Amino acid sequence: MTVRGTIPPSVPSGHLPHKGGDHIVPQPLKSLPWLTRGCLLLPPISPLMGEMSAKLTEGGNSPRKPFDPLDCDMAAEWAGPRPSILQSISDAPWRTQGDTVERIELLAAELVDGETACPESWPNTRMVLSEIASKLQPSILACGDAEISALLKGLDGRFVPPGPSGAPTRGRPDVLPTGRNFYSVDSRAVPTPAAYELGKKSAELLIRRYVQDHGEWPVSFGLTAWGTSNMRTGGDDVAQALALIGVKPVWDMTSRRVTGYEIIPPAMLRRPRVDVTLRISGFFRDAFPEQIALFDKAIRAVGMLEEDASDNPIAARMRGEIARLEAAGLDTASASRRAGYRIFGSKPGAYGAGLQALIDEKGWERRADLAEAYLVWGSYAYGAGEEGKAERGVFEERLRSIQAVVQNQDNREHDLLDSDDYYQFEGGMAAAAEQLGGARPSIYHNDHSRPERPVIRSLEEEIGRVVRGRVVNPKWIDGIMRHGYKGAFEIAATVDYLFAFAATTGAVRNHHFEAVYQAFVVDQKVRDFMAEKNPAALRDMRERLLEAIDRKLWTPRSNSARFDLESLSKGKEAAA
């Protein structure tokens, strides 16, 4: 039996981990790649905490700023101590804080593997290693048998023991071993205080990045919220949306459930509020009605504030829309209701964003066709007391004015070229906003895999990282080829999703397609592997690359690229 492999969160050195396809289970902890083990171990424990504190008083960017290997400037000069145990771990140059983090990782790997003995004078590290040996390692080893046993019990109609849900790479080793009937979070406690702190930090970094890119304060963002990710994180997306509009949840101190919200005054916020339009998934709609009502009430309350338009564009916009709707004949209550809609999703009972069939079946001519599908599928308004009212015009009005599309990724167990959901929601919103507003909005794909250090990246940057770090990485290709038919399918699916991002956003550059072409078509080893193990996957990949050329999404450097691909279509290369 196999289980889907994982892409762990980025380790502190900033490397993008790769996965080798489906992993055979069970595996000892030592047999896992260090990147996977490191991500399981980093939160919430550090193998060097205590003996070499994770927050040294030396080595930071300034005398007053401590060095934290989980949240530091990797390119900054290292000004701290150079212990002999770290000097001997690598012959590589030691100049930056990133070099220091890399040495700490290498030492941690050797300690976990038992290749380096843990000094007696490091009691805290010895405690952590004992915890790994007594709890984490057995939990990982138990996963395979537990999943097989639970599957057979479920098929036989017998009891499957319950267990918590979450991402083990985000500080939740208690979800191991897998194979249990997992239960979710208490939705009344979402967003959690921890999620709000992450959401607040991410919101501030997002605003800072926008100001750096555009030289002005942002006014309106479009944000996607998925149910599964918010279950794993305790509500990162909801928390970020609340932080952007300048609102903080209020929790009951006993139950830790959310009981309301607090509007942060401009003097404390120290920046303008940002108008946020939420595009929720169908599962989010079903699982988090309290959070829908919370955000709806909060943004309407912010819209009623008597604040300057420069501080509160939400209120300025709502006042203007109410006046316009009243002039068109609506009563004040109806006008206020429509002007306050900020949460949209698919109609009740429906799921997805509506783009997958168009992409798969080539049922579109222009990007406007994809935008239309996104608008038709997601133009139903939700809120407190509102459960999917058709409001196409209001949805269009919201998307017409958004300046940035925001998508958060809560873990590194997958990437944006692993799933069709990212291009459908993120790409669909971008296509619709471009079609309605006449200009392509900025697109930010944020990394929340390490709660202590959220990272804001543009979609172009994220696609570049994934293409270089995973898609055309020889280590990933060698690993995926070990799995025959399914490995070839994964390669073709990755090319599909890359093409879909090019179609919806234009964020895929020629060199991205060129790298894929060189890795999967020009490389005879990979081409022959796909032809032998999964000819259908090779055909699908070839057709997708030819479609990219035909639609002018990719202009190959080589004049022979089309000929090579068409030769495959005639079976010449497949038979060679």
Task: Write out the residue ranges for each language-model feature.
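Short, tandemly repeated low-complexity microdomains enriched for cysteine and small residues
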Residues: 23-33, 54-62
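Short, exposed "boundary/linker" segments that immediately precede the start
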Residues: 3-10
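Extended, structured, electrostatic nucleic-acid-contact surfaces
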Residues: 35-46
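Ligand/cofactor-recognition surfaces for anionic moieties
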Residues: 1-2, 63-576
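Glycine-biased, low-complexity coil/linker segments
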Residues: 20-21, 50-51
